[in-house]
Amino acid sequence: MIAAAFRRWKHARRFARASAEIMARDIAPRPHGLAAPLVVSLTSYPARFPNLHLVLRSLLAQTLRPDRVILWLTRDDAARLPDSARLPGLEIAICPDWRSYKKIVPTLLEVPDANIV
């Protein structure tokens, strides 16, 4: 019981430190220099929405700037997306519920010649 409480406290402390570091980052990335567009493609689901803004902010604050960052969601999930996850520079796109494939298949169909991460 004490060990579990300690683990929760330690996790919360680590999470708070990481969150503060991500939120304090200066967003001034440099161009990637690739011949083809660089696209970051990802998906999520409602259980992960509470922390999604941190993931997105971290992706948008990388040292190399992608041409596009696309978050693929189902229509139902997009309706539940919190405002904290709607960040400048992020494209929110709707696709069928292809589970984990919804992060790559729609991007391949939309920008087949891009470098996709």
Indicate where each model-derived feature is located:
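Flexible, charged surface loops at secondary-structure boundaries
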Residues: H32-A35, T63, L109-P112
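Aromatic/hydrophobic pocket-lining residues that form the small-molecule binding cavity
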Residues: L52
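Membrane-proximal basic amphipathic "stem/tether" segments
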Residues: M1-R30, A35
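Active-site-proximal specificity loops/subdomain of glycosyltransferases
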Residues: W72-N115
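Cell-envelope/extracellular polymer assembly enzymes that use nucleotide-activated donors
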Residues: A36-S41, R68
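A conserved hydrophobic helix/loop-capping motif in glycosyltransferases and polysaccharide synthases
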Residues: V39-A47, Q62
